[in-house]
């Protein structure tokens, strides 16, 4: 099974991807996570350091694939998850899609691409140009990471459009949305009502998820010394269980941009009476007292 993870830049794709990879490994699966970002930091919380990229390794070998060994590019991460970083072209030059293609080509040359139960592509930001949409060519499922905000859901809608386009020629389906670090899901629910798709999970708004990235650890590793985090790990295990059940998935029909803009902005500009009441804080009530 191959999964491509997309979402708005900075939404927490890599942190979420790493924890999903660990959850899949905890379910007894052999997992490979491939970082598809020029920053090459996708697998940082799994390995604890920035591993060399495929492109760096190929350049050092003058692109002689026969001189590259699996241990040159595949690094063992926490929980037994194998890690690869594709890297990227120089800034302002080249194509990220080419880099992804070269990565898959090399892994096939090394007979590694088909050795895993699950391969997870963690893809750069919300860029859905032909280049960075390349992982969708190999994926069985796409997962979109979002939060309960306007920008993230707008990006999710554009990614959904890419999934629909790729599904014309590939056996690709959208597994669903994952809400990351959000205390509410009302705007998410409003979006999936307009663009039907599963919501796999909504992760709680806790600081430890963000801090784990800085520490270079997954929530599962942090939970070894902080038992209070075990309940957070259960969220990722639930996502893993849903993925491993081979869900039917959907081919989404994205909402037209102007219609979505109106839908999401109206949610903020014209909230219902109950929503207005919920937004009143104790401090604002103090000012209203006579």
From Swiss-Prot:
The keyword Iron applies. Mg(2+) binds at residue 14. Keywords: 4Fe-4S, ATP-binding, Chlorophyll biosynthesis, Chloroplast, Iron, Iron-sulfur, Magnesium, Metal-binding, Nucleotide-binding, Oxidoreductase, Photosynthesis, Plastid. The keyword Cell wall biogenesis/degradation does not apply. GO terms for molecular function: 4 iron, 4 sulfur cluster binding; ATP binding; metal ion binding; oxidoreductase activity, acting on iron-sulfur proteins as donors; oxidoreductase activity, acting on the CH-CH group of donors, iron-sulfur protein as acceptor. Its EC number is 1.3.7.7. Binds 1 [4Fe-4S] cluster per dimer. [4Fe-4S] cluster binds at residues 95, 129. Its cofactor is [4Fe-4S] cluster. GO terms for cellular component: chloroplast. Its main location: plastid. It catalyses: chlorophyllide a + oxidized 2[4Fe-4S]-[ferredoxin] + 2 ADP + 2 phosphate = protochlorophyllide a + reduced 2[4Fe-4S]-[ferredoxin] + 2 ATP + 2 H2O. ATP binds at residues 10-15, 39, 180-181. GO terms for biological process: light-independent chlorophyll biosynthetic process; photosynthesis, dark reaction. Pathway: Porphyrin-containing compound metabolism; chlorophyll biosynthesis (light-independent). It holds the Pfam family Fer4_NifH. It is found in: Plastid, Chloroplast. PANTHER family: LIGHT-INDEPENDENT PROTOCHLOROPHYLLIDE REDUCTASE IRON-SULFUR ATP-BINDING PROTEIN. HAMAP family: ChlL_BchL. Component of the dark-operative protochlorophyllide reductase (DPOR) that uses Mg-ATP and reduced ferredoxin to reduce ring D of protochlorophyllide (Pchlide) to form chlorophyllide a (Chlide). This reaction is light-independent. The L component serves as a unique electron donor to the NB-component of the complex, and binds Mg-ATP. Belongs to the NifH/BchL/ChlL family. This is Light-independent protochlorophyllide reductase iron-sulfur ATP-binding protein. It comes from Chaetosphaeridium globosum.
